[in-house]
């Protein structure tokens, strides 16, 4: 991976912010 990690992290952050 490398760039995909950013996407996965964004998804996680959104879940937390939600």
Swiss-Prot record:
Reported tissue expression: Nacreous layer of shell.
Superkingdom in the source lineage: Eukaryota
Name by which UniProt lists this protein: Uncharacterized protein IMPP16
Organism, as annotated: Nautilus macromphalus (Bellybutton nautilus)
């Amino acid at each position: 991976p490398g760039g995909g990690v950013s996407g996965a992290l964004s998804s996680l952050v959104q879940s937390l912010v939600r």
